[in-house]
Amino acid sequence: MLEFKEPTGHDPAGYHIYKRSRSPYERFIEGEGIPIYRGIGVYDTRDLPLGKWPRLGGRGTYLLLEGCESIKGMFVLEVPSGDALKAEKHVYDEFFVVIEGRGTTEVWREGSQKKHVFEWQPGSLFMAPINAYHRLVNATNSPALLLAANNAPPVMNLFQSQHFVWNNNYDFNERYGDSDDFYKVNTTIEAEPVRGRAAIRSNLFPDIVNANLPLDNQRAPGYRRIAPFFNGFIPDASTGGFIAEYPAGRYSKAHYHLSGAVLVCLAGKGYTLNWRTELGPRPWEAGKGDQVKIQEYKAGGLVAAAPGGGGWFHQHFNISNGPFRIINYWGGPTGHWGGIFEEGSEDEVKSGNIFGIREGGRTILYPEEDPWVRNYYRQRLAEEGAEFTMPESMFEEPAGVR
């Protein structure tokens, strides 16, 4: 116990400069003995150093991305060739995207004789249900690499009990049952009940790299998108993240929302611009372009779309000769209901992708953006031998707007 020293005179009490306290989640991952990557993004997760992971039996590295520290846990996991990881269960949700390799996953409830087994390949997305045992198996002669996302940070920070997280016998039977079709692939497209955009209910998506995506057009012309809905979660705009694709030569409108969104590149390559909203919609024109962050990535890379606690504009660009596909990688529910895209308590919410900031939305429409954005994008496309395909009509002010 530290001794408190009362100040004298008018001096303030306590340390004037002190080290930041680590959260329970940070303390947990720092004790795991594997590398921890900190930053805004990664060009390619295959390039991250991996350390031997005693708890799971493979190799891995944690990702502690800016703005996601208390919201979303992430790690890269290598399953050795011809081997399997140790089985585990925990009281938080977890999802996996396969970067490289093929294998199977076994899932079962404690005390149950029923075991679900399904196969995965590059581009597979699947869920490990809360507090269900799961084990990853690699039957090939080369290592498999997977990227995981979960909501361990808010769970560990809230309960502050490792025993509760790892040794809890509660059966979440409304979230995971014994039905044979729990991991049956579903291809039926429906509408999100809140926002009306495309969605699919499934717990296993065999190939999100090549799956057909419906036209959406909200984020950019020709933009395609679908939201995965997983079992046991209320199917609205808060759950599942989304899989999206930009055509060659096109880019998104800049927009902002709370932190937590992590975009993982599935195909093609691109870059993301990030800047604080305080810099305004035209930071380069205002002479503040040096304060804008840029993150490059290819298939297997990723970026924290809204770092710094949120309130950052971010904008995504396809510099491939073909389609540029990403997944907004969800890690499970957190303390924010309504998702990171909705704020306030109004009954009606304006779609942040459709309404510009002058209309009460959270998007910089193409006619409002800084001219530097388009000029730089044209330059990057030329360097890649790709063409600019944005319709010129996108940059015209609507009638009556000045």
Question: For each predicted feature, which ranges?
Answer:
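Conserved short histidine dyad/triad with adjacent acidic residue
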Residues: 55-62, 73-90, 242-256, 273-280, ...
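His/acidic/aromatic-lined binding-pocket segments of jelly-roll/cupin-type domains
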Residues: 76-77, 85-89, 93-98, 117-118, ...
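Glycine- and acidic-residue-biased ligand/ion/polar-headgroup-sensing regions
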Residues: 80-81, 90-111, 247-248, 257-287
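Short acidic-glycine-tyrosine-enriched beta hairpin
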Residues: 109-130, 277-311
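Ligand-binding loop in jelly-roll beta-barrel domains
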Residues: 121-122, 127-159, 299, 307-337
